[in-house]
Amino acid sequence: HEIRRQNAGRTGEMAGGFAADNFHGIKTALRGVLKIADLGHSVLGTRLMSGIGKAIHKAGVPLWTPSMPKSYNASKRIADDEGEGLKVVYFPSCINQMMGVDKSSKDMRPLAEEMVELLHKAGYKVVIPKGMDSLCCGTIWESKGLPKMADRKTAELEEALWEASEEGRYPVICDQSPCLHRMKQKMTRVQLYESAEFVWKFLRDKLVFTQK
């Protein structure tokens, strides 16, 4: 990360700052790109879309493949549960907030919705942090050599999780291990769990699991 920090330069810092300040808008724009790609796939078909994807990939555009996920907006599809009882805070990773499943998937439910459904089956009420579309653990900025910006986004997320968990009263789930790794390194006020870890520790005595 130190080498990347040195290479980032003033331009990198400005770009990182813009992304941090406008993260909600960036997520919205990326969802739009995914919608356009999905529409193109539906209209043109896999073969022609793959050819176009390979051609524009030569110009530096990320390569399109048939497994590219559809656009998804977690903040509009999952919401807080009301009432008392067992509660858990769920923060879907940025990827799972924006991306659903691909066109050929047999199960069309995005991961975030599957997680919420599982928690409901176990009797948990799910709390979603406020302003989720603007929040990020900071890993994106850390990976680009922008530690100060990364720490800023981590602090923003911790504050939102602190509020959502009622000052640490309820556990917090994040569904991406790399994100959770950074969160556990930087956050001290909330109880953090990866999805499988939470299921093993808290749900295994509340649900019946059937191997398929």
PLM segments and residue spans:
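Iron-sulfur cluster-binding electron-transfer modules in prokaryotic oxidoreductases
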Residues: E2-K212
